[in-house]
UniProtKB/Swiss-Prot annotation:
Pathway given in the UniProt record: Cofactor biosynthesis; NAD(+) biosynthesis; NAD(+) from deamido-NAD(+) (ammonia route): step 1/1
Coiled-coil intervals: none
Organism: Burkholderia cenocepacia (strain ATCC BAA-245 / DSM 16553 / LMG 16656 / NCTC 13227 / J2315 / CF5610) (Burkholderia cepacia (strain J2315))
Protein known as: NH(3)-dependent NAD(+) synthetase
UniProt-annotated binding residues for ATP: G51, I52, S53, G54, G55, V56, D57, S58, T168, K197, T219
Length: 282
């Protein structure tokens, strides 16, 4: 591809992911709190539910959710926010998760250990006669099972409490497809959409998040053979490079190539299930 081709695709992706050319953290906070509040009221439901991992994304989305239900209550609408801790046994960075909960200040906190369910599913797969190619493949699949068990737990609570599940996907993760389909990608509303990682951190900082939260190294921490593996190691590019791409800045050819490879390979994650009427795309 030529430089012009790269730039053309970059502009199209930025538009698709709704990344604005300018960023004002305080304005984004108010806009996103208002969005959450108006949406919940429009549904007639009463509760937001979100899993809090300890990272900046869930911390930021959680604080926005709490402020949105407080705004609704001040306006006479009964609403509340439930933060869920969803560890897989003992979380490696539990101290960070507790710090995040203190920042979010949710109305209610529920803790559900997904390890028994995730491990039982893996055992059932193995007992069925299914054989994994390698231990690494089994570990990867097991990690996605954990993410989907977390989704199940959040929807169980939402279903019982007239609730809506919040997701933490933002433009950088959406671009790279770095979420589990029907796992952490399974949600009803995405208050961080349109923000790249740099801007999520800017919102978190403006909300009063301490630097240990704002600058925590992003990790899905789903794989037991590679605990706390940073997202950037999986990408092969840094968040700064991804964010520069999303802000329309020129990046190195290797960054263009890596980003576009991840973006094209994860297109199905950003779409509703395909039918014969919409695939292949015209």
């Amino acid at each position: 591809m030529t430089s012009a081709d790269y730039a053309s695709r970059q502009r199209a992706i930025i538009a698709e992911l709704n990344v604005a050319p300018h960023f004002d953290a305080e304005a984004e906070i108010d806009r996103r709190i208002d969005f959450l509040a108006q949406y919940l009221r429009s549904t007639g439901l009463r509760t937001y539910v979100l899993g809090i991992s300890g990272g900046v994304d869930s911390s930021t989305a959680g604080r926005l959710a709490q402020l949105s239900v407080e705004r609704l209550r001040a306006d006479g609408y009964d609403a509340r926010f439930i933060a869920m801790r969803l560890p897989n046994g003992v979380q490696n960075d539990e101290e960070d998760a507790q710090r995040a909960l203190a920042f979010v200040r949710a109305d209610e906190v529920l803790t559900v250990d997904v390890k028994p369910a995730a491990d039982a599913m893996l055992r059932s797969l193995v007992a069925s006669g299914h054989a994994f190619d390698t231990p690494a493949q089994q570990d990867f699949v097991h990690g996605n099972i954990k993410a989907r068990e977390r989704m199940i737990a959040q929807y169980a609570v939402a279903g019982a409490r007239r609730g809506i599940v919040i997701g933490t996907d933002h433009a950088a993760e959406s671009l790279m497809g770095f979420f589990t389909k029907f796992g952490d990608g399974g949600a009803d509303i995405l208050p961080l959409a349109g923000l790249n990682k740099r801007r999520v951190r800017g919102v978190a900082r403006a909300l009063g998040g301490e630097e240990l939260i704002v600058m925590k190294v992003p990790t899905a921490d789903l794989e037991e053979l590679r605990p706390l593996r940073p997202d950037e190691h999986a990408y092969g590019v840094t968040y700064d490079e991804i964010d520069d791409f999303l802000e329309g800045k020129p990046v190195a050819d290797r960054v263009y190539e890596t980003v576009l490879r991840f973006y094209d390979g994860s297109r199905h994650k950003r779409a509703l299930p395909y039918t014969m009427f919409d695939w292949p795309a015209a």
